[in-house]
Amino acid sequence: MAAPGERGRFHGGNLFFLPGGARSEMMDDLATDARGRGAGRRDAAASASTPAQAPTSDSPVAEDASRRRPCRACVDFKTWMRTQQKRDTKFREDCPPDREELGRHSWAVLHTLAAYYPDLPTPEQQQDMAQFIHLFSKFYPCEECAEDLRKRLCRNHPDTRTRACFTQWLCHLHNEVNRKLGKPDFDCSKVDERWRDGWKDGSCD
């Protein structure tokens, strides 16, 4: 141990540990200034008082943070726009879909697949379509939506025996989701008009 008057001095050959396990050896041959303080001690104090530099805009840390963006497929348009209020850029139509847009397009694809499904599918076609629906629920981009769909499929397995069975099964599944979201039911007797043949009034001709 050092004598009371010698606390803080490092003799030649003594070792001390720095953060990270690095070791540094202090030598006694440092020149002293007019007040008797070591130049090395003065330099250490000066460097300790220098504030740490914040990451610049072109630093890897800042660049990595700028790339992190919320999941558009997981939120609706209004929520997404609230996160973009500080941006001056105008909304473009060719941006990634938000949760509502993704849902609309996904249901359109599923209903159209059902509308053109074979009237009397083979056993292999029945199995393939049922498997497709289950795989769709596993890879759907909105995880909350996908989890909800998987739970519904466990309770209500896809009915792919015929085209009529499949279109009605999908329509009732869609209505279950609509009710959860507070949306009105769709008239399932009109699935062919909506997704294959067009409305009887000729408005789609």
Swiss-Prot record:
Gene name, Swiss-Prot/TrEMBL: GFER
Q: What is this protein called?
A: FAD-linked sulfhydryl oxidase ALR
Keywords assigned = Cataract, Cytoplasm, Deafness, Disease variant, Disulfide bond, FAD, Flavoprotein, Growth factor, Mitochondrion, Oxidoreductase, Phosphoprotein, Primary mitochondrial disease, Secreted
> Which SUPFAM superfamilies does the record match to this protein?
FAD-dependent thiol oxidase
Q: Which residues bind FAD?
A: 99-107, 111, 140, 171-183, 194-195
Q: What cofactor does this chain's UniProt record say it requires?
A: FAD
Record: disease: Myopathy, mitochondrial progressive, with congenital cataract, hearing loss and developmental delay: A disease characterized by progressive myopathy and partial combined respiratory-chain deficiency, congenital cataract, sensorineural hearing loss, and developmental delay.
From the record, give the cysteines joined by S-S bonds.
142-145, 171-188
Q: Which InterPro entries match?
A: ALR/ERV, ERV/ALR_sulphydryl_oxid_sf, ERV/ALR_sulphydryl_oxidase
Q: Which PANTHER family match?
A: ALR/ERV, FAD-LINKED SULFHYDRYL OXIDASE ALR
Question: A GO CC term?
Answer: cytosol
